Regions:
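Short, small-residue-rich loop/turn micro-motifs
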Residues: 11-13, 90, 145
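Active-site/binding-pocket entry motifs
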Residues: 15, 21, 92, 165-166
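Active-site neighborhood of HAD-like aspartate-dependent phosphohydrolases
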Residues: 1-49
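Short acidic, glycine/proline-rich loop/turn micro-motifs
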Residues: 19-23, 60, 154
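Asp-based, Mg2+/Mn2+-dependent phosphohydrolase catalytic module
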Residues: 2-7, 64-85, 93-123, 127-175
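Short glycine-rich anion-binding loops that position phosphate/pyrophosphate groups of nucleotides
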Residues: 14, 55, 128
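Substrate-recognition element of Asp-dependent hydrolases with the DxDx(T/V) motif
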Residues: 34, 38-71, 82-95, 134
Length: 175
């Protein structure tokens, strides 16, 4: 079986507006252009995954059921079938965790489960931890200037205005 390529996205602040421990599906607001960008990735043969830290669960600020309801709304707004998988880490920031970004555990898990070529893949996020996660996993990285990315500085392969612009760039520069 040939290895597949993927684009890994952070969720909060990258695909949807940052709302600080979103536990209510009514607060989910996907950024403009995200659904069309995800469709373009699928049309180009990429798998699409969401890689998200959800420490609000580990800190008792939301339940896993609330998280799953929010995630279902994200999937609905993004477009059914456009996100191939979601990996989340509920560990609190102070916990030692191989899965919590910037550690690459969730990306590596997805790569094994889906036969992904990480060198031919990308990680898109709004925080230095997202970029570092992608770098540690062996992907190319894109920092977006939405969410926390407005003020983040880190050595990403590219800096884009938003997720849609990131997809434009990666499709133009994919080799």
């Amino acid at each position: 079986m040939s290895r597949r390529r993927a684009v890994f996205f952070d969720r909060d602040g990258t695909l949807i507006e940052e709302t600080h421990y979103c536990a209510d599906p009514a607060r989910v607001k996907i950024f403009p252009g995200v659904s069309a960008a995800l469709r373009r990735l699928h049309d180009a043969g990429f798998l699409v995954f969401v890689i998200t830290n959800q420490s609000g669960i580990g800190q008792g600020l939301m339940t896993e059921a609330q998280y799953r309801a929010v995630e279902a709304e994200v999937q609905r707004q993004a477009g059914e079938g456009l996100i191939d998988g979601v990996y989340f880490c509920a560990d609190a920031p102070e916990e030692a965790s191989a899965r919590r970004k910037p550690q690459p555990g969730m990306v590596l898990e997805a790569a094994v489960e889906h036969g992904i070529d990480l060198e031919g893949s990308f990680f898109v996020g709004d925080k230095a931890a997202d970029v570092e996660c992608g770098r540690r996993a062996g992907t190319r990285t894109i920092l977006v200037r939405t969410g926390y990315g407005v003020s983040e500085e880190c050595p990403a392969d590219f800096i884009a205005a938003d997720a849609a612009a990131a997809v434009d760039w990666l499709l133009r520069n994919d080799s």
